[in-house]
Amino acid sequence: MVNLESMHTDIKMSGDVADSTDARSTLSQVEPGNDRNGLDFNRQIKTEDLSDSLQQTLSHRPCHLSQGPAMMSGNQMSGLNASPCQDMASLHPLQQLVLVPGHLQSVSQFLLSQTQPGQQGLQPNLLPFPQQQSGLLLPQTGPGLASQAFGHPGLPGSSLEPHLEASQHLPVPKHLPSSGGADEPSDLEELEKFAKTFKQRRIKLGFTQGDVGLAMGKLYGNDFSQTTISRFEALNLSFKNMCKLKPLLEKWLNDAESSPSDPSVSTPSSYPSLSEVFGRKRKKRTSIETNIRLTLEKRFQDNPKPSSEEISMIAEQLSMEKEVVRVWFCNRRQKEKRINCPVATPIKPPVYNSRLVSPSGSLGPLSVPPVHSTMPGTVTSSCSPGNNSRPSSPGSGLHASSPTASQNNSKAAVNSASSFNSSGSWYRWNHSTYLH
């Protein structure tokens, strides 16, 4: 009795209330009969104390239960020593698994509520929790699981296997949506490569961008402009339109290379003529018969610039088109201007410089009067009729336009200089036959 009461104050583990009661009942049978009433009284006290200690130990971690069996002695706690150790061995990895995720507080509360009836009923309820733990931890990402595995090295290998398998399969759905985007850059590279190849092969075959559009319209029924083909080669179209246009261009290119002599592929419009290159069709040169040309010459002499009604009448008489007659009169007037240009245009009187010789040779030579020796003081020089107030300079020679007068220019200049030095007087001479 003394030993049981002294050990009661040091018990800190939780056990089944029924097992402890049975153990004490076996001890009470060994004692003498006269002490039975004392044992019953102590049994009630210990039962109440054990129930209080059970609630206190449940509030702490189960790891404190390992202190209890060390204080037990003898065969009295043999029944309590076997089952709590097995329970602790099974609860130790479970407690670490429960504490790993932060959102499983409800699970820990469920564990505490299940441990109150007894330790034997606790073990079968907690056995399925490793499977539930693996199911609850599947949504977590791989890095989170790795950090938890390093933070809790006490986890057994069997509990880490479902987490590692889940971490391997988790990144797969994240990359699935980007698989479509990974194909798009490859398609863009293929389109860029095809556009460059298409341009080179098209130029090699001798087709223009407009030829490709017209040929595709005749062959496949889809007309494309030159701008569309140009934008495709420059990658200026949208991705969707380029994907639609690529198979058609590829088909046309293969047909053009396989059968370049095919008239359906190399149509006449594929090779533009000279008129199409310059943008307008050149008209054929009009040839007019000789008798009609003579008639038109007579009408031109009568009226160089006929009206529209007169041109219509001439065209009807000569059985010609009105536009042809009009153009002929226009060309004839231009020809007349080129022929009679010096006669038709009046000549303004030029202002001569004293040191220059007139270059015009059509006006005829100037008549230069002789310089007499009996008149030493006179100086004869020519001046323009419109420049009467301005005499010529003393050093100027006789102005002439003929080659003979220009050759004698130096001699006349010497004579005029000597006469100027002797007399110093000036005379102006206007030639009556000098016409401008």
UniProtKB/Swiss-Prot annotation:
Domain of life: Eukaryota
Annotated GO CC locations: chromatin; cytosol; nuclear body; nucleolus; nucleoplasm; nucleus; plasma membrane; transcription regulator complex
Biological process, per Gene Ontology: epidermis development; keratinocyte differentiation; negative regulation by host of viral transcription; positive regulation of transcription by RNA polymerase II; regulation of transcription by RNA polymerase II; wound healing
Chief site of localization: nucleus
Molecular function as annotated in GO: DNA-binding transcription activator activity, RNA polymerase II-specific; DNA-binding transcription factor activity, RNA polymerase II-specific; identical protein binding; RNA polymerase II cis-regulatory region sequence-specific DNA binding; sequence-specific DNA binding; sequence-specific double-stranded DNA binding
Location in or out of the cell: Nucleus
InterPro entries in the record: HD, Homeobox_CS, Homeodomain-like_sf, Lambda_DNA-bd_dom_sf, POU, POU_dom, POU_domain_TF, TF_octamer
Keywords assigned: DNA-binding, Homeobox, Nucleus, Transcription, Transcription regulation
Tissue specificity field: Specifically expressed in epidermis and cultured keratinocytes.
Database matches in PROSITE patterns: HOMEOBOX_1, HOMEOBOX_2, POU_1, POU_2, POU_3
Biased composition (Low complexity): 258-275, 381-397, 405-421
Coiled coil: none
Domain POU-specific positions: 183-257
Function in brief: Transcription factor that binds to the octamer motif (5'-ATTTGCAT-3') and regulates cell type-specific differentiation pathways. Involved in the regulation of keratinocytes differentiation. The POU2F3-POU2AF2/POU2AF3 complex drives the expression of tuft-cell-specific genes, a rare chemosensory cells that coordinate immune and neural functions within mucosal epithelial tissues.
Protein name listed in UniProt: POU domain, class 2, transcription factor 3
